[in-house]
Curated annotation (Swiss-Prot):
<keyword id="KW-0055">Arginine biosynthesis</keyword>
<dbReference type="InterPro" id="IPR036901">
    <property type="entry name" value="Asp/Orn_carbamoylTrfase_sf"/>
</dbReference>
<dbReference type="GO" id="GO:0019240">
    <property type="term" value="P:citrulline biosynthetic process"/>
</dbReference>
<feature type="binding site">
    <location>
        <position position="151"/>
    </location>
    <ligand>
        <name>carbamoyl phosphate</name>
    </ligand>
</feature>
<dbReference type="GO" id="GO:0005759">
    <property type="term" value="C:mitochondrial matrix"/>
</dbReference>
<comment type="pathway">
    <text>Amino-acid biosynthesis; L-arginine biosynthesis; L-arginine from L-ornithine and carbamoyl phosphate: step 1/3.</text>
</comment>
<keyword id="KW-0028">Amino-acid biosynthesis</keyword>
<feature type="binding site">
    <location>
        <position position="330"/>
    </location>
    <ligand>
        <name>carbamoyl phosphate</name>
    </ligand>
</feature>
<feature type="binding site">
    <location>
        <begin position="303"/>
        <end position="304"/>
    </location>
    <ligand>
        <name>carbamoyl phosphate</name>
    </ligand>
</feature>
<feature type="binding site">
    <location>
        <begin position="73"/>
        <end position="76"/>
    </location>
    <ligand>
        <name>carbamoyl phosphate</name>
    </ligand>
</feature>
<feature type="binding site">
    <location>
        <position position="154"/>
    </location>
    <ligand>
        <name>carbamoyl phosphate</name>
    </ligand>
</feature>
<dbReference type="GO" id="GO:0006526">
    <property type="term" value="P:L-arginine biosynthetic process"/>
</dbReference>
<keyword id="KW-0808">Transferase</keyword>
<dbReference type="InterPro" id="IPR006130">
    <property type="entry name" value="Asp/Orn_carbamoylTrfase"/>
</dbReference>
<keyword id="KW-0809">Transit peptide</keyword>
<dbReference type="Pfam" id="PF02729">
    <property type="entry name" value="OTCace_N"/>
</dbReference>
<protein>
    <recommendedName>
        <fullName>Ornithine carbamoyltransferase, mitochondrial</fullName>
        <ecNumber>2.1.3.3</ecNumber>
    </recommendedName>
</protein>
Length: 349
């Protein structure tokens, strides 16, 4: 039988329905994204009060979640394993020494075999094509825990963090299922345009949050990602706007939140000297925020790991910094996503 004619075996006469995957925030409607954030917030409050929501108790009992990580990880691994265990499931970690995607066997073979033995695949990979191919041939939900292009779990955690700090200040908070009460907020991204930014900007557009991006010339958001961000405006009553500049001070003007990330991602080590030179004027400092005219109560975020050239100690360890709650929120984001895509089979409510 030709490979493209293969169908998963079932005890019946027909193949199972195609599972729903989470590969990018672009896969979600505004209401679905807002619901994932709200659920994460609710579960965080309940579980940290030494209680477990009834809908999560044993929700993954008897289920195995395969964690296929071809890239090293700290927060993603700990948050995902912790989420699975809290929900009563079994996390199975498959690192790069256990499995090499597309090396010893095709991605097709890997996806078909592993998905026949587990209830979900959480994958942290390199090229987006790897996660897309895993999902294409998987018989169970695939959740993107990071690829070179997107990082949806980080975006959920980031908006949970922003929601906790700013939503109560908005008069529109909680008035519509597709709203997080953040309309009109401004995020300034200062640094490299990367996978974290891409999903953050898509989410912001859906939530009515404006994003101003400052990168050195030559490090801007790729045109095909800009198109995807603009597409996220469709069907949104008051979508957020995206602007780009090469001047950090321009980006941070009137910013509520200033965000940065590593300047040298995994796989870019050979570009270190070039990148350090290109980004030398993009360090987040109190002086930068003051020169640019950020709002008086601006907050700082960074998904970690952090390097001293990216942000000053003064900002990173200040009361403005949300980096440690942001990191913790990866756990609650993972719980929310696992419930939606594994327990509820893609129905987000």
């Amino acid at each position: 039988m030709a490979k493209n004619q293969w169908r998963p075996y079932t005890n019946g006469s027909h193949a199972p329905s195609t599972p729903r995957h989470l590969l990018s925030i672009a896969d979600l409607t505004p209401t679905e994204f807002a619901t994932l954030v709200r659920n994460a917030s609710s579960y965080k409050k309940t579980i940290k009060s030494d209680s477990m929501p009834e809908r999560l108790t044993g929700a993954l009992s008897g289920k195995t979640v395969a964690m296929m990580f071809s890239k090293r990880s700290t927060r993603t691994r700990v948050s995902t394993e912790g989420a699975v265990v809290k929900m009563g499931g079994h996390p199975m970690f498959l690192g790069k020494d256990d499995i090499q995607l597309g090396v010893n066997e095709s991605l097709y073979d890997t996806s078909v075999v592993i998905s026949s033995m587990v209830s979900c695949i959480v994958a942290r990979v390199g090229p987006h094509s790897d996660i897309a191919n895993l999902a294409k041939h998987s018989s169970v939900p695939v959740i993107n825990a990071l690829c070179d292009t997107f990082h949806p779990l980080q975006a959920i955690a980031d908006f949970l963090t922003i929601h906790e700090s700013f939503a109560s200040q908005s008069a529109t908070h909680g008035t519509h299922p597709s709203s997080l009460g953040l309309e009109g907020l401004k995020i300034a991204w200062v640094g490299d345009a990367n996978n974290v930014l891409f999903d953050l900007a898509i989410a912001a557009t859906k939530m009515g949050v404006n994003v101003a991006v400052a990168t050195p010339r030559g490090y801007e958001i790729p045109s095909h990602i800009v198109e995807l961000i603009q597409k996220a405006r469709e069907g949104v009553q008051s979508p957020g706007n995206l602007t780009q500049t090469t001047v950090p001070e321009v980006a941070v003007k009137d910013a509520d939140v200033i965000v940065t990330d590593t300047w040298i991602s995994m796989g870019q080590e050979t570009e270190k000297i070039k990148r350090l030179e290109a980004f030398k004027d993009f360090k987040v400092t109190s002086e930068l925020a003051k020169r640019g005219g950020a709002k008086e109560n601006w907050k700082f975020m960074h998904c970690l790991p952090r390097h001293p050239e990216e942000v000053s100690d003064e900002v990173f360890y200040s009361e403005r910094s949300l980096v440690f709650p942001e990191a913790e929120n990866r756990l609650w984001a993972a719980i929310s996503a696992l419930e939606a895509f594994v327990v509820n089979k893609g129905k987000i409510a």
